[in-house]
Amino acid sequence: MKLYNLKKKQDQVNFSKAVKLGLGKNQGLFFPKELPILTKEQLYKLLKMDFLTRSSKILSMFIGDEIHYSELTKRIKNAFSFTTPKIVSISKNIACFELFHGPTLAFKDFGARFMAQILSFLNHDKNDTITILTATSGDTGAAVAHAFFKMKNVRVIILYPKGKISELQEKLFCTLGENIITIAVNGSFDECQKLVKQAFNDDQLRIETGLNSANSINISRLLAQICYYFEAFALLTKKQQKNLVISVPCGNFGNLTAGLLAKALGLPIKSFIASTNSNDTVPRFLKTGFWKPNNTVSTISNAMDISQPNNWPRVEELFKRKFWSLKTLKYGSVSDILTKKSLKKLAFLGYVSEPHAAVAYYTLKNKLKQNEFGLFLGTAHPAKFKKTIEKILQITLFLPSKLRNQIKLPLLSHNIRPDFSKLKKFLLEK
């Protein structure tokens, strides 16, 4: 598999190199040079397979012979060793696709655990230490931390905006210690992402620390997420499959990119909805044609509090490659007031959700046509937002054992200002 740098297309690497580098020159994202296309017969066979077998087939289409199929299958089995995604009916023509049944109760478990398995394989006969540097607006931190926890020759540094993620999200990854180092940045998530990008642009840091990223900018995480879109389609009836619309809660737009890649492979999804909160750079761009990121605002759907989404260049590249018009991509932005109304509506229908899924549900409900079937993605367990949900819905949420075990542990985070010189010093000395 060859991938090219979106900022310098002559900069081409194989899959293994792309995973190890994370980003190309000039902070460019890697994108597949060739996109496989499934025949109707191949698609039919894939949809009949179980989740793990199908995932192995899909990922081998991209990775090819760089990793032997038997080894890839083993790594996928290790990565996806948890309850498969579920579809829960909400109303006659709407359902939620729950992706939060993994170790850290969020969809990020799929990509983070697959990336950890791939890096472990690529580094198994080497003694070089890899430094995973990543920024999180909520769920990525926990997924990455647990995926790489105690992994040999890997240290993980996670930046997050201080006071701007939920207490339970913070407890899931800032209490581990060992090879997991967490840094609370006195700033926004966009400032955390900027620090990560500056680090990747620093040759000294990259060489001396073996720098890599576990954000959705890493191609291994992105490709892993394609797999659950096929699972969603396979779980539906033929009638539901016919005019399928999927609403994706969007922050960094990696989840949407993966869904669009699944469509590009031949999965017959009618359309996608890019659903954001008040940080609506993309909806405004799709409406006006002008890319004007505003200052990031804090919302109750905090994992989407991102004004400059990293993966948007990949979305644009895919639309160009497939000759799709961006006008066909539906979109919507949802305020906190409407998010709360959406949560209450879902609760009235008998489904307790959380803010990110509620955003996706709101846009889906308002854009779905009579002859269409809609899925919205449930990206995190409601208990991760316990205080918010209990306050809005006036209910008591019980914590899953995974959260109960960590809520009592002390935070081990360091604190810094959003100053790259401070981060660089920390990385070189730690």
Swiss-Prot record:
Catalysed reactions, as listed in the record: O-phospho-L-homoserine + H2O = L-threonine + phosphate
Asked whether the keyword Amino-acid biosynthesis is assigned, the reply is yes
InterPro entries according to UniProt: Ser/Thr_deHydtase_PyrdxlP-BS, Thr_synth_N, Thr_synth_N_sf, Thr_synthase-like, Threonine_Synthase, TrpB-like_PALP, TrpB-like_PALP_sf
GO BP, one annotated term: threonine biosynthetic process
| Pathway(s) per entry | Amino-acid biosynthesis; L-threonine biosynthesis; L-threonine from L-aspartate: step 5/5
Needed cofactors: pyridoxal 5'-phosphate
Q: Which residues carry this modification: N6-(pyridoxal phosphate)lysine?
A: 108
Its Enzyme Commission number?
A: 4.2.3.1
GO terms of molecular function: pyridoxal phosphate binding; threonine synthase activity
Q: Which domain of life is it from?
A: Bacteria
Q: Which UniProt keywords apply?
A: Amino-acid biosynthesis, Lyase, Pyridoxal phosphate, Threonine biosynthesis
Say which enzyme class the record assigns.
lyase
Q: Describe the function of this protein.
A: Catalyzes the gamma-elimination of phosphate from L-phosphohomoserine and the beta-addition of water to produce L-threonine.
Which family does this protein fall into?
Answer: Belongs to the threonine synthase family.
Query: Record's NCBIfam families?
Result: thrC
Q: What is this protein called?
A: Threonine synthase
The organism of origin for this protein:
Buchnera aphidicola subsp. Baizongia pistaciae (strain Bp)
Q: State the organism's lineage.
A: Bacteria, Pseudomonadati, Pseudomonadota, Gammaproteobacteria, Enterobacterales
